[in-house]
Amino acid sequence: MKNIFFVLILLTSFNSHTQNFNNIYADVMKIQQNSYADVKELYNEIVKPTYKDEEKVYAIAKYITENISYGKRAKFPLNTINSREGVCQDYSELFIALCDIAEIKNYYVSGDGRTSVSDIGFYNSNHSWNVVEINNEFQIFDLTWAAGYVDGNNVFVKSFNPFYFNPSPSLFILNHFPDEEKWQLLNNPVTKNQYINQPTYDQSIYNLSLKTGIVRDNNFQI
């Protein structure tokens, strides 16, 4: 048996211009659970008049990830709001509906989302996420994966993962491949063949904020 030491060179989970939105999140967490007659009614509860565009986006994203669980297809944004569940398409469509009210440019992106080593070698356009344009910059949001994950018993576990609010495109491409190349947002796009044959990365690695570190596994054997 040998102890294996891995030296990992890690990027921070958040790019340099990501701000601290804790005050915005605190406002969102105060919103009471209600039934709504229309999407605009919810929007008025989420977004305060003083919010800047980026703050509006993060408030909307935080509300959705805190209040919507992965479950049955809702089909319409208002259904998603009131049933408090949906699939990835519902997360994306509700985000679009709220961003449209805020008059923020946003885009629906479909593509492949990888969650298992069994996905290696295959491509399946089975997922959706969003891109917003703020101050002439594109930002990626995957609210489904930010809201939580499906465990080994196929049960959705609510667990906020802030990595999927504006992740670096170079990290996002490790487990997301858009059907349209332009939404990679990379200067040197990855080919589909490169993507499907690369390793699958566990989402937990993105939560590490160390730039360098040593990870030790005393149980690893070769």
Question: Predicted segment positions?
Answer:
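Sec-dependent N-terminal signal peptides
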Residues: 3-14
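Secondary-structure boundary elements
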Residues: 19-87, 93-102
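Hydrophobic/aromatic-rich core segments of domains that either
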Residues: 93-171
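Alpha-helical and coiled-coil interaction segments, frequently adjacent to or embedded
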Residues: 151-222
